[in-house]
From Swiss-Prot:
Organism name: Human herpesvirus 6B (strain Z29)
Subcellular location: Host membrane
Upper lineage: Viruses, Duplodnaviria, Heunggongvirae, Peploviricota, Herviviricetes
Tagged with keyword Transmembrane helix: yes
This protein's name: Protein U9
Membrane topology listed for this record: Single-pass membrane protein
Length: 104
């Protein structure tokens, strides 16, 4: 459950992009994670990256997806640490814990 909540928060951060295509791809990644868990992202990785790499607005989402796909998370705590570190880099130091608490 914690992983789903964290991923949803990350997707929400990226979905602020003005690009409709990028928002759609963020949704695709969210659905994949909710259905199959963190490991399920691996199945969708090539598709998501192939779509996002075409969009300059989607660069940070593409980078994050690439990083997530390289990781092999054994539990939600590992996922949390990784997501927090990377989301702060990507969104310029946004307090991720605040966003996570607001997300339901």
């Amino acid at each position: 459950m914690a992983v789903r909540k964290l991923w949803k928060t990350v997707v929400q951060l990226f979905s602020k992009s003005k690009s409709e295509e990028c928002n759609t791809e963020a949704g695709t990644m969210e659905v994949s994670c909710l259905k199959y868990g963190v490991q399920g992202l691996n199945a969708d990785c090539s598709y998501v990256k192939s779509q996002c790499i075409k969009l300059s607005e989607c660069e940070c989402l593409y980078t994050f997806a690439s990083d997530v796909c390289k990781e092999d998370f054994h539990n939600s705590e590992e996922m949390k640490v990784f997501v927090v570190q990377h989301s702060q880099e990507i969104v310029g130091g946004t307090d991720f814990s605040v966003h996570a608490e607001e997300s339901v």
